[in-house]
């Protein structure tokens, strides 16, 4: 099974490191992670992903107003029917990607909340509009905590998927 993770990029942020912690530990003979990145430049984890057998695809930056962005997204899903599991990590704007995946026949569409709030600026109202649509297009809702799930999915049912942390890296060492 190939799972397509939709991310901004694979730099060394919290979400990206969590995904890599899972990726390093899964049985890659049974499940393979591929990544759809919204940046054109290479990211920190890209080489490691490729070494482990993952593929990296690039599309333009996520822009809810761009016809070019949306057509590129639809083209991607139409050209890659092998992806029957799409796991989207795009916060409030995940519904845009989930809708395209649904219309192109992707059977399992996961939205994942990684935060429990959003800056209350001018963009917030727009993001609320898209956030409310997430449960309509997702088949599964995940959150890193109860708070993150309640914030992003409101009253919809979601599952908490705890962040993968390599605890051995944080064990006390007298040598340090």
List PLM regions with ranges.
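Membrane-interface segments of envelope glycosyltransferases acting on lipid-linked substrates or membrane lipids
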Residues: 1-176
